[in-house]
Amino acid sequence: MRLGAPAAAVAALVALVVAAPAGAVVLRPCPDSPTARCGTIVVPAVRSDPSAGTMRIAFRRYPALGGRALRTVLAIEGGPGYPSTGSAGYYLALLGPARRTTALVVVDQRGTGSSQLIDCAPLQDFPYAPFAPVALRPYRRAVARCGALLGSRSDAYGTGAAVDDMVAVMDALGVPRFDVYGDSYGSFAAQALVLRHPGHVRSLVLDGTYPLDFDPWARDALAVLRSALRATCDRSPTCPWRTADPGERAATLARRLRARPLEVESRDPGGRPVHVRLDDRGLAGVLAEADGELAIYRDLPAAAEAYDDGDPAPLARLAAEAFAGGANGPAQYYSAGLDAAVECHDYPQLFSLSASPVGRLAQLAAGLRALPADAFAPFDRSTWFGADLESYDWCIGWPRATHAPDPPRPAGAAYPSIPTLVLDGDLDQRTSLIGARRVAARFPDSTLVPVANQGHVTALVDWYGCAAGIVRRFFATRRATGTACAARNPALHLVAAFPRTSRTAPEATPASGDESFAAQRRQAWCAAQAVADAIARYPVIPDSSGAGLRGGRFTATGAYLDHGPVTLRLKGVRFCADVAVSGRVVWQRTSGRVRAVIAYGASRVSLAWSLATLAPAVLRGGARRAGSPAVALRLTVPAP
């Protein structure tokens, strides 16, 4: 396709400033990987201003295991702020069997990882205090201080400069054309790369993507939250909100928490005691994490019902899990300063960055007042804005740019006709399917694949293998094939109830040969839920160890990224307070099959079901009674 004059001029300029001779970089073995080779290049800090100095850009190359690479994939991590080298294990797992003929390159974006680092203490060391009142906004002030510390380089960390760096690395490696995979913010950067360097890109995969000109109010996120609450309920026969409006039930819960916040002792994912204070803004924060922690969708309806019945434990646990992140840690693993520098340079703002801080704040306030009352349903405006979940006001005090504008998409740059695959989970709030459709429509040769029952980013932790397989085939053929599995991705099994004890629990269903009585059937239901609950916690537990809802511990073994089986060992795990479950559980992640041998009270049973279907769990075994023959247990439990 012939570029128009403005775009051609931009493309020529970009080619001049990023070109590097092949073989112009020295590669050395990486200290923590026997096969990877590490290197660095030096690039201009500001390509339009030679006096601005230089920056160091670090990268890794993983060769094709079969020797000769038929293709090279450049993988770009999300954030902003996370280094791509830190997620290399995820990208290698994604390539899987394709690694034999595929090389992988990961480049740490300027500002993070082993590249020229932004380690901005006001942000990096910011005390973790979510949901501060709007009037205080201490994080906004920390962002302003960080911008001031960066000085004349505060506008030197934009996405455009970062992807120019990546192309410079590929040129130095002698790879003139390559495939690109970007996840989350990495897909934003990948769009910028292909718009600035279309001739370098062989094919493009955008996973969990959003438009460069997204809505800065993030209203798409709330629309998806409402639809996801409805969809997860409709798809799970055990959802207690199936006959209600889930969005309205969430709104009712928010109003109740606003009137009387929940304060209770709970436990974090590792089982450590934590004090939870949950108000309406806190609930907004919990639900904002649901596309990354699907247990929130799984548990919320039943947890809300339990809270209404006077039991705060399930809801408090969701809050403890959602807010367990804590402080930022070292900047090389996540640079909060880079996050702010990118957002204040590239992201659409709710005010003009040419205005003064006072003027920016006035424009933001006016925009908020102009929104309809239900703009952030199921939350009202003050709840959602006050939850401080989006970067609405981060850039109020960010310095004005001192160099020529360098937006991610150069003026006049057209979306190229390059084979493009766009993946998005239908439960993804932060990079919604609404935005993904807009992105796909802009690329002339694109295929959009919605992935059912999946949250944020579909292919990196894809235990069923559907999205990952689509990506691998796409890189091999540059065509989206075998996509039907995306619509069949298994639904979540929502919790039916959180009874405090087995006395108020639902009963398991007797099958042929069962000799149980009602109390044993209720205990069996509790035992099955204890096993399912431990599996649901697996993605969030630290150090492979977690706690039961009402007591007990469990451990998990099995590499997170290899998609092999996970073995869980339960010791006194209590979903219901009076049913302590111990035993061994094997969960086959690729098939969803669960097999358990457990004991609780006088019962010894086996338990089997699949997370990939809605078929009930089958429980077989016996219960001993003092002085009496064993009672045969032959029961089923709705898919836990």
Where are these regions (language model features)?
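Generic alpha-helix initiation/capping and coil-helix boundary signal
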Residues: 1-8, 296-297, 429
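Secretory targeting and sorting signals
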Residues: 2-24
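Solvent-exposed, charged interface segments at domain starts and junctions
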Residues: 10, 23-24, 28-41, 103, ...
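Gly/Pro-rich cap/lid or specificity-loop segments adjacent to the active site
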Residues: 25-282, 347, 351-640
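Alpha/beta-hydrolase-fold enzymes
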Residues: 235-348
